[in-house]
């Protein structure tokens, strides 16, 4: 059953990535790949923490979402190819900017995803000092 969920969610994630490519693709900078990777970092951090603690969704479906959807939506291989293409075309500033935005931005998006999840999970709690 796990493979079915990963496959179904993977197909949806791949279609969403393709749609983002159509919407943001083109130009000299790989903005579509950067966008899907940053969104994916946020979604993985948020959804995996929030859904695991708050919902009744089974672990099999959670893994399908994380491995399938987010895995197919994000792309390290396209990031790597895009970076090499920027370097080979002499666009060093774009290449360095892209690498920094991807890594630093990814970490920031994970932090935001976890912060939002924590905020929503702790929303109804009242602490007595």
Curated annotation (Swiss-Prot):
Instruction: List the catalysed reactions.
Output: fluoride(in) = fluoride(out)
Query: Mainly resides where?
Result: membrane
Residues given in the record as Na(+) binding sites: 71, 74
Query: Known activity regulation?
Result: Na(+) is not transported, but it plays an essential structural role and its presence is essential for fluoride channel function.
Localization terms from the record: Cell membrane
Annotated Pfam families: CRCB
Q: Where are the transmembrane segments?
A: 3-23, 32-52, 59-79, 90-110
Q: What is this protein called?
A: Fluoride-specific ion channel FluC 2
């Amino acid at each position: 059953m796990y493979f079915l969920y990963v496959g179904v969610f993977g197909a949806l994630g791949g279609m969403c990535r393709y749609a983002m490519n159509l919407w943001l693709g083109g130009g000299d900078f790989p903005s579509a790949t950067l966008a899907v990777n940053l969104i994916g970092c946020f979604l993985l951090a948020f959804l995996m923490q929030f859904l695991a603690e708050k919902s009744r969704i089974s672990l099999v479906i959670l893994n399908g979402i994380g491995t399938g959807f987010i895995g197919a939506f994000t792309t390290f291989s396209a990031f790597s190819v895009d970076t090499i293409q920027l370097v080979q075309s002499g666009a060093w500033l774009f290449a360095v900017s892209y690498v920094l935005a991807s890594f630093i931005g990814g970490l920031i998006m994970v932090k935001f995803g976890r912060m939002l999840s924590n905020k929503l999970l702790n929303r109804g709690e009242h602490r007595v000092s």
